[in-house]
Amino acid sequence: MPKVMSVVAVVLGLVVSAVAGCSSSPGSPKQQLIQNADDTCRTINKRFAGDLAYGQGLGAGDASKLRERVNLLKALRDQVRKMPNPGEGQAQLDSWLDKVGVYITGLDDLRGQLQNYRLGMDLVLALQMGVNEDAAKAVGPAAKRFGFEECAKTQKWEYLAS
């Protein structure tokens, strides 16, 4: 009987190890897409909160930060578009890509407004910041619906320190 228990324990150990190995390595195209995009989003989130953060306010000097934010997000979007079809959840993925596109457009618009700033444009900039904040907030839930984790962490994308 003890030998049987030992064999059962070994077999169970192998089964558990095999199952754990399968769950940690992405197998489906959707899981590969999620892992690759989340890796990129992790870098984007660090950069948006680090060297590309707005700080106390937004000014003409931040145009280069906005350009870099746009470039990072476009690269993410292109990376995801080049990945194989996820097999399931395509509608949720398309919704997320659309929301990322809206946010990219908003950032690019803000960059142009900063570069062409004239006295009295403060209200225009404030309105665009509001549009961008709403767009950033829309990206997170759409990412979550598809299954992304890091790409859903958009809380500080439009954060201004107070």
Regions found by a protein language model. Give the residues of each.
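C-terminal motif of bacterial Sec signal peptides marking the signal peptidase cleavage site
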Residues: 18-21
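Alpha-helical segments in soluble extracytoplasmic regions
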Residues: 30-114, 121-161
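Bacterial signal peptide processing site
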Residues: 23-25
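Hydrophobic helical h-region of N-terminal Sec-dependent signal peptides
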Residues: 9-16
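Bacterial N-terminal signal peptides that target proteins for export
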Residues: 1-9
